[in-house]
Amino acid sequence: MGKKKLLKNYRTTNLINTLEQVDYVVLAPGISFIKNKNLIKYKNKIITDIDLFYLINRNVKSIVITGTNGKSTTCKVIEHLLKKNKLNCFLGGNIGTPILDFNKSKKNYIIIEASSFQLFHSKFIRPDFAFFLNFRNDHLDWHGSKSNYFKSKLKIFHLQSKKQFAFINKKFKKNFLKNKFLSRLITSKQREYKKIKIKIDNDYLTSKINDENMSYVYTFAKLLKISDKSFISSMKSFKGLPHRFEILYKKNNITFINDSKATSFAATEIALSSIKNIYWILGGLPKKNDKINLTTYKKNIIKCYLIGKNISFFEKKVKGKINYSITRNLKNSIVKISKDIKLKKLSNKYLLFSPAAASFDQFINFEKRGEEFKRLCKTYARKFI
């Protein structure tokens, strides 16, 4: 159907008539409910693809994971853990295969990454294991407020029964209890995990957010009666996801890290707090209401390199706080860093691309941005270092 014909058939009046006649409307996550008056009127009919999955599959063991940062990596870690321990599983939702492509034959568990957009509309999501990893300011342009964003995350627990498990950050325990959710509240075994993590020695799991989220995974492993020996062995072989604190290679005490997925400062903070002696590439399309405060992290940053079409915005944030250069694009940044990095004699140095901004000013998505960074590192940085 052509665009003109589609618009003719689905003008506002026709759309409202359609909404009145159907039982449910499966809404795409990118559509802002708050900004559409017609959708608000029919909010009780709006569901998501995950809801539809639960309506179709009533007797499947499900693990649903949400949180501002680290959802995808945590999903992949749990998938890896289950497979290594000979437990069949399916990974879907916002990562991997679309959730409605799930085939339940011979699958012990389904792992679902759920966004705040999906949880906002959720009416049938009832995980056996629900993880609310963390919460930071993000997606406020979609949700309208921090309060709405937080309430969306909490909806992961709404339909759980007394036999199901809720993994939640200690900071939000009061919120959980206030809502009188029925599920069994599980707090992560952080102390126990710290004792064994030294035996894992996996660069892909070294960032502070992964450290925090791994304690949830360890706690989950204990519920499944997976031994420490099996857990350590499984985690040693885990390979991280592309563009998420992705360690490209190490050379002459210099580590190259691709963190292109960091599209907000809240995400970049994790990288800045996890390492020191950083040559940091920053810039892109800043998110609405994103606050950049370098007070805590400036001691870890040797120099910053500003890229993208919003240089003035980022320059105001770093000027007078850290040393910086305006390099405008990734190629110039890598060439400049390759020269600057030789000036400091330090045992360990990090070339970190964690832009703290969306990619759309120069790239179509964060994946393309990350791939370009990797290509340039291979082409230029290795020649100079």
Write out the residue ranges for each language-model feature.
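Adenosine-cofactor binding site in Rossmann-like domains, unifying the SAM/SAH pocket
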Residues: 2-14, 192-202
